[in-house]
């Protein structure tokens, strides 16, 4: 009897120890799972992280969109300013062209206008003595650019040219010894015309 009870007691104690070890191992496993679950990020945590990431991404996109809008507005303002500057320069160019054409017309009308002014002065002063008007006209004719002065200059050059041709012809023929013929100096009259030799024909105009 005592042997059977002792064996049962031993079996019971062994079984109790085995059961206790299995219970402790189960509790340790659950504790590990619980600790792991508490230390990690669950599906709720992952969903919250994704939402924050989306919010940051949306904020970045909104900032980029606002920057693009500001750049477009600045570009539009610059284009408007350039268009205004272009219109102003176009008007300035037209004004300068008109002034240039006006100055060119004035330059073309200058001789005629001066003649008209002189005619107007002569008509406004009919009582002026004839000698003064004649002297004034003679003075205009004696100007370097007047037709009378140009004609006198042309005649003088023609005389010099003919004398040079005659001298060259005589030297080529050998009929003229050196220093035999002296060229008479050109003499100018009071009116500015040169005195022609009687043997040299007058130039035709």
From Swiss-Prot:
Stretches the record annotates as Disordered: 1-49, 113-149, 174-205
Gly residues compositional bias, start-end: 13-23, 34-48
Residue positions where Phosphoserine is found in the record: 146
Compositional bias per record (Basic and acidic residues), positions renumbered to this chain: 24-33, 196-205
Coiled coil: 66-110
InterPro entries per the UniProt record, alphabetical: CCDC89-like
Record field: transmembrane: none
Composition-biased stretches (Low complexity): 1-12
UniProt keyword terms in alphabetical order: Coiled coil, Phosphoprotein
Name under which the protein is recorded: Tumor suppressor candidate gene 1 protein homolog
């Amino acid at each position: 009897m005592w042997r059977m009870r002792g064996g049962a007691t031993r079996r019971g104690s062994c079984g109790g120890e085995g059961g206790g070890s299995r219970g402790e191992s189960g509790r340790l496993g659950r504790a590990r799972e619980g600790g792991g679950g508490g230390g990690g990020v669950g599906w709720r945590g992952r969903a919250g992280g994704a939402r924050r990431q989306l919010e940051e991404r949306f904020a970045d996109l909104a900032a980029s969109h606002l920057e693009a809008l500001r750049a477009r507005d600045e570009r539009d303002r610059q284009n408007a300013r350039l268009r205004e500057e272009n219109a102003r320069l176009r008007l300035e160019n037209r004004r300068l062209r008109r002034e240039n054409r006006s100055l060119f017309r004035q330059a073309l009308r200058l001789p005629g206008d001066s003649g008209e002014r002189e005619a107007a002065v002569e008509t406004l002063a009919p009582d002026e003595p004839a000698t003064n008007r004649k002297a004034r006209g003679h003075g205009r004719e004696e100007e370097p650019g007047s037709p009378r002065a140009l004609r006198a200059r042309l005649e003088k050059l023609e005389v010099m040219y003919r004398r040079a041709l005659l001298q060259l012809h005589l030297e080529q023929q050998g009929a003229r010894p050196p220093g035999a013929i002296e060229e008479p100096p050109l003499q100018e009259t009071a009116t500015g015309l040169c005195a022609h030799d009687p043997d040299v024909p007058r130039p035709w105009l």
